[in-house]
Amino acid sequence: FILGCGVAGLAAIGTSKALGSVVRAWDVRDVADQVHSMGAKWVSVDFKEDGAGEGGYARESSDAFKKAQQETFRKACEEVDIVITTAAIPGKRSPLLITKEAVKCMKAGSVIVDLAAVGGGNCELTKKDEVYTTENGVTIIGYTDLSARMANQASAMY
């Protein structure tokens, strides 16, 4: 399940599909066509609100939308093995997308990779610059320097 379909999110979709995964994705902006074109299923929140801001970036959502969004994501988290979050709002804290209740609903052995940890994280339980496993067996990765940790591999791929 990919949350945030900007550059990093679309790359995560492409890599996940290449590895044979069934991919679901969401973004506050209307990018369903891009998500479908990459072979992923679009997850929609049953609430109408335009989340596009200036320059094609996301803007902050209303409280009512956030509530509907978090319930949609909680239900999705029950069914997936990995959640990759990439949602950010320039100059602001990363939006909270995955609540602790959603993490409690996930299967043991599931993983959350919070690429928005540098801005506080999209997951309520993310610990900045840490990896840990919750009581129910979900591993949460909150590194803020993930690309630097993979420098040798990234250089070899280049």
Language model features with spans:
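Short, conserved loop/helix-junction motifs that constitute active-site signature segments
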Residues: 103-107, 133-134
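Glycine-rich phosphate/diphosphate-binding loop of Rossmann-like nucleotide-binding domains
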Residues: 1-76
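Glycine-rich, N-terminal phosphate-binding loop of Rossmann-like dinucleotide-binding domains
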Residues: 87, 115-116
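Adenosine-phosphate binding glycine-rich loop
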Residues: 123-158
